[in-house]
């Protein structure tokens, strides 16, 4: 942390924690559940109901303006189109341009359930954190990691800097770079821009300097 006192103050600020938690909940649902599922549909509708450029709680103005434009353009995309895109991005077999699992980036063999996943699991056990199973996917799936951010914001905010700095942000920027370059729908591109902007701003506000890992993708 660059400024521990400032970080501690923000982590005890109820307004910040509620804003960060709500943002991560909506984004995490959209990036972990099929668009045809009711909860994902509600989360998508909630984001579309917000003036993202003006009222989204975290993110730089340029990124939020871009996200708002993309999400607005994506309003014409139907659930079937979005579901096919979700399956291609998150559930398809074979090599994906942007694998949504952290250890694919940090493990030399580019595999799921790699060493950083094991480290994350050990960290979660040490702090008594449970993560509900999600179709047999590892906990370091990007949407599940956002949902874990939300859980920490509501239950144990002091763990947020370590979680972001050690377990998510060492690889998330590379994921978003590849993810945004592989988009075929405006909706998911907008969600990706919004998620990246939210995490980047939270790290900046909290003074988090992510750990440096060698990335293999």
Language model region names:
Residues 1-217:
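Surface/interface-facing alpha-helical segments and adjacent flexible terminal/loop regions used
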């Amino acid at each position: 942390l660059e400024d521990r006192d400032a970080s501690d103050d923000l982590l005890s600020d109820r307004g910040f924690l509620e804003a960060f938690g709500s943002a991560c909940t909506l984004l995490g649902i959209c990036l972990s559940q099929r668009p045809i599922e009711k909860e994902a549909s509600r989360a998508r509708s909630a984001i579309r109901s917000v003036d993202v450029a003006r009222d989204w709680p975290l993110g730089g103005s340029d990124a939020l303006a871009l996200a708002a434009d993309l999400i607005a353009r994506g309003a014409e995309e139907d659930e079937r189109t979005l579901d096919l895109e979700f399956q291609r991005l998150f559930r398809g077999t074979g090599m994906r341009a942007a694998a949504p699992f952290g250890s694919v980036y940090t493990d030399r063999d580019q595999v799921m359930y790699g060493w950083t996943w094991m480290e994350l699991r050990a960290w979660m056990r040490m702090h008594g954190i449970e993560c509900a199973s999600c179709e047999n996917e590892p906990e370091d799936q990007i949407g599940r990691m956002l949902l874990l951010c939300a859980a920490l914001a509501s239950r144990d905010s002091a763990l947020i800097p370590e979680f972001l700095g050690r377990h998510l942000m060492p690889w998330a920027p590379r994921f978003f770079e590849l993810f945004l370059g592989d988009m075929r729908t405006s909706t998911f591109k907008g969600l990706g821009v919004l998620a990246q902007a939210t995490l980047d701003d939270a790290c900046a506000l909290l003074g988090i300097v992510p750990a440096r890992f060698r990335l293999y993708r």
